[in-house]
């Protein structure tokens, strides 16, 4: 299989078993002339560096924003930021990289996953995977600080109650965009320092 074939099969988000997906791929793309086991596929896929997927993702995002007619709300482009904890396979390598959560039941390898999503154009524009004890605010600050999309003007970053902090407001005002804003839901007792 070529690098392109591995990437194509991997991003298909197969609804069937891996072997059924591989068989369908080879039937459609290679006229069924090749048989490939899921073990051989997994071994080959493991040789692909995660950076390849990051670069592919960034290329898709950049291409979209170069060419798309972007929707806006009263001249503003809205980007939601949120995070969650994601359970990962329990391997030593992942445990060392992302940490183990032990607060509920058996220990579980988890990562903090944060995402910035274009609310009006339906596109994930940035993500972060971090240690399970990392802060959603730190991930949001990092995504806001590295925000660089072509043809985006007047971005507004929308976040829930867990995010309000002066450091996030500062991060959004440091961007090169002329008008940048952050909008956070806050508890009633929230106090601005």
Can you annotate each of these PLM segments?
Residues 1-193:
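Conserved, well-structured functional cores that handle cations and Mg-NTP chemistry
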């Amino acid at each position: 299989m070529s690098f392109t074939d591995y990437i194509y099969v991997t991003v298909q988000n197969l609804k069937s078993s891996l072997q059924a997906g591989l068989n369908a791929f080879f039937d459609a793309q290679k006229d069924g002339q090749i048989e490939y086991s899921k073990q051989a596929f997994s071994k080959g896929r493991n040789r692909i560096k995660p950076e390849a997927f990051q670069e592919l993702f960034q290329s898709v995002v950049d291409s979209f924003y170069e060419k798309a007619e972007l929707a806006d709300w009263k001249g503003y482009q809205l980007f939601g930021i949120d995070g969650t904890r994601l359970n990962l396979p329990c391997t030593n390598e992942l445990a060392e990289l992302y940490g183990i959560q032990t607060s509920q039941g058996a220990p579980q390898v988890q990562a903090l996953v944060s995402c910035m999503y274009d609310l009006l154009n339906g596109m994930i524009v940035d993500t972060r995977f971090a240690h399970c004890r990392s802060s959603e605010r730190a991930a949001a600050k990092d995504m806001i600080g590295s925000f660089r999309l072509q043809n985006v003007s007047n971005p507004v970053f929308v976040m829930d109650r867990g995010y309000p902090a002066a450091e996030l407001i500062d991060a959004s005002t440091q961007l090169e965009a002329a008008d940048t804003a952050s909008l956070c839901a806050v508890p009633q007792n929230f106090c601005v320092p």
